């Protein structure tokens, strides 16, 4: 149940909130929101959320970005 709520929240963000941001360009492939979806689907709500938060913290102006799939 928690997994479903998290996934719906991320999808809501992608559809309604992300387009409102200026310079909405993720440095990583897949994007941080897609990474979060993949991590939650693969590892569950708790571990997947933790992985997503770590990824979002790495996504900053000083990071190189690049290809970083869920492992």
UniProtKB/Swiss-Prot annotation:
Membrane topology: Peripheral membrane protein
Record-linked Pfam families: YidD
Key words, A-Z: Cell membrane, Membrane
InterPro entries (alphabetical): Membr_insert_effic_factor_YidD (IPR002696)
GO CC, one annotated term: plasma membrane
Cell compartment(s), UniProt: Cell membrane
Superkingdom per UniProt: Bacteria
Family: Belongs to the UPF0161 family.
Function: Could be involved in insertion of integral membrane proteins into the membrane.
HAMAP family, per the entry: UPF0161_YidD
Name listed for the protein in its UniProt record: Putative membrane protein insertion efficiency factor
Organism annotation: Clostridium acetobutylicum (strain ATCC 824 / DSM 792 / JCM 1419 / IAM 19013 / LMG 5710 / NBRC 13948 / NRRL B-527 / VKM B-1787 / 2291 / W)
Lineage: Bacteria, Bacillati, Bacillota, Clostridia, Eubacteriales
């Amino acid at each position: 149940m928690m997994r479903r709520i998290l996934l719906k929240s991320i999808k809501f963000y992608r559809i309604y909130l992300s387009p409102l941001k200026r310079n909405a360009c993720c440095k990583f492939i897949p994007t941080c929101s897609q990474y979060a979806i993949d991590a939650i689907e693969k590892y569950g709500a708790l571990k997947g959320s933790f992985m997503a938060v770590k990824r979002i913290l790495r996504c900053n102006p000083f990071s190189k970005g690049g290809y970083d799939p869920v492992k």
